């Protein structure tokens, strides 16, 4: 699954949707952590109350200290980690879009954050502020394929989302399309 998906392409507007936390791996970990945490919590409570709360095993025969309390502790931790994963999915952390508008000569980068006053992070730049587009390609154990917007006096701003690196051809095509649209040079390819 790609980190950015082209949404709108026209002569005057280019918009890419950035997938945040709503990736298949996050769904998998949310289910696994919630299920495991619930199982361990019920096993710990079964050993405390001496009553079987799990249909597929008999944790009521466990001694509460140290096995039951350890299982209860790990169950609560797993459940909290699962809750965090579900909330990050609900809030779509990191999701947003990159919009390049020729009419207004503006670049708008929007990302979703945690709830509160600054939930939506919105960055706006003029086309004139853009120095170039940089592509980072790093292979190996921890591969990285990313596109950065170089802004004069401000450094590099990532345009691609996190997660599984997109295919090389997709990164190259997207970077070339954005560089052509902005009429700037492309570095790193």
Curated annotation (Swiss-Prot):
It comes from the Bacteria. The chain crosses the membrane at residues 25-45, 62-82. It is a multi-pass membrane protein. Keywords: Membrane, Photosynthesis, Thylakoid, Transmembrane, Transmembrane helix. It is found in: Cellular thylakoid membrane. Signal peptide: none annotated. Pfam families: Ycf4. Belongs to the Ycf4 family. Seems to be required for the assembly of the photosystem I complex. NCBIfam families: PRK02542.1 (NF002712). This is Photosystem I assembly protein Ycf4. The lineage of its organism: Bacteria, Bacillati, Cyanobacteriota, Cyanophyceae, Synechococcales.
């Amino acid at each position: 699954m790609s980190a950015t998906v082209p949404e709108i392409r026209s002569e005057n507007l280019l918009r890419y949707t950035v997938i945040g936390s709503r990736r298949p791996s996050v769904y998998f970990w949310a289910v696994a952590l919630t299920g495991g945490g619930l199982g361990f919590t019920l096993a710990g409570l079964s050993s405390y109350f001496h009553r079987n709360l799990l249909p597929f095993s008999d944790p009521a025969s466990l001694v509460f200290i140290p096995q039951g309390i350890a299982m209860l502790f790990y169950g609560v931790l797993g459940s909290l980690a699962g809750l965090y994963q579900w909330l990050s999915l609900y809030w779509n952390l990191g999701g947003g879009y990159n919009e390049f508008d020729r009419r207004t000569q503006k670049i708008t980068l929007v990302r979703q954050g945690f709830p509160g006053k600054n939930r939506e992070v919105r960055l706006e730049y003029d086309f004139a502020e853009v120095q170039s587009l940089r592509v980072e390609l790093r292979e190996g154990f921890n591969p990285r394929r990313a596109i950065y917007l170089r802004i004069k006096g401000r450094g590099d701003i990532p345009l691609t989302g996190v997660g599984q690196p997109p295919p090389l051809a997709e990164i190259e095509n997207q970077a070339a399309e954005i560089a052509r649209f902005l009429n700037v040079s492309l570095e790193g390819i």
